[in-house]
Amino acid sequence: MTDVMRDVASLRMLQGMWRRAGETVGLVPTMGALHDGHMALARAAREECGKVIATIFVNPTQFGPTEDLDAYPNTFDSDLHMLREVGVDVVFAPTRDVMYPAGFGTTVKVAGLTAPLCGAARPGHFDGVTQVVAKLLNLGQADRAYFGQKDWQQLAVVRQMVRDLNFPTEIVGIPTVRAEDGLALSSRNAYLTEAEREIAPILYRTIRDAAARVAAGHGATGVCEAAARGLLGKGFTRIDYLECRDATTLAPAETPDPGTARIFVAAQLGGARLIDNVSVG
């Protein structure tokens, strides 16, 4: 039976019992509106750890003032059912007041990796991400924490934070889960109309083809610019970025060695901002 906890004291008490019993703890941070991508994280944690905590918290500090905080899907009952099916031990679902009580004033900022891509398109976003992840890692006291590779930049930022601040947690990246037509699973896919959902898989095909061209020796800048124009001609209304960057440093990569770079994209389609990335070579 999966327990639902909303306060820190209860979670701490349970963790103390687990630690005394020598359990390995896995943490799966989410904002809810779960799909098979989240379930891949939970299943990996279940397979590798004696105890698993999943968190459901829509973190307000990682949303900009014009973004979709108020519209973000709330599907708690179905989320809980899915997590129970996987065998998660505890769902930690705090309120905003629990996470950010009156007088809260601490931020965590990772320099460098947060500057390009989503960091440039969504100022302040990663400050909110590192703030909440630092809190969840502290509260979860996990041996391992699981993140999806669809949010590659987020994964890189969290790994940097964990290294820099000496968190005793291994950050585990899980490959992107896709629909049969290639679209990366995302909670924000729910914003797509039926017609937009037909268009959406073009995003993955476009960056996959761009990655193949860069791997074949074509210059990344020209390839990515052409790919972005192609998306705008097929129904996407804005391209925040479509770039080839080093997979580790996120520095621009014009003619990368095989396996060292990725093509990153963020594009608006109707009411949904879709992100994805693929390896070059």
UniProtKB/Swiss-Prot annotation:
HAMAP family linked to this entry: PanC (MF_00158)
Family: Belongs to the pantothenate synthetase family.
Protein's UniProt keywords contain ATP-binding: yes
Anything else known: The reaction proceeds by a bi uni uni bi ping pong mechanism.
List of residues binding (R)-pantoate: Q62, Q154
Molecular function per GO: ATP binding; pantoate-beta-alanine ligase activity
Organism for this UniProt entry: Dinoroseobacter shibae (strain DSM 16493 / NCIMB 14021 / DFL 12)
Pathway where this protein functions: Cofactor biosynthesis; (R)-pantothenate biosynthesis; (R)-pantothenate from (R)-pantoate and beta-alanine: step 1/1
Keyword Cell membrane: no
Residues holding beta-alanine: Q62
Active site per database record: H38
InterPro entries: Pantoate_ligase (IPR003721), Pantoate_ligase_C (IPR042176), Rossmann-like_a/b/a_fold (IPR014729)
Record protein name field: Pantothenate synthetase
Major place of residence: cytoplasm
UniProt: ATP binding residues: 31-38, 148-151, 177, 185-188
Reaction it catalyzes: (R)-pantoate + beta-alanine + ATP = (R)-pantothenate + AMP + diphosphate + H(+)
Cellular component GO terms held in the UniProt record: cytosol
GO biological process: pantothenate biosynthetic process
Enzyme Commission number, as recorded: 6.3.2.1
Sorted UniProt keywords: ATP-binding, Cytoplasm, Ligase, Nucleotide-binding, Pantothenate biosynthesis
Pfam family, one: Pantoate_ligase
Function of the molecule: Catalyzes the condensation of pantoate with beta-alanine in an ATP-dependent reaction via a pantoyl-adenylate intermediate.
CDD domains recorded: PanC
Compartment(s): Cytoplasm
Subunit-structure text: Homodimer.
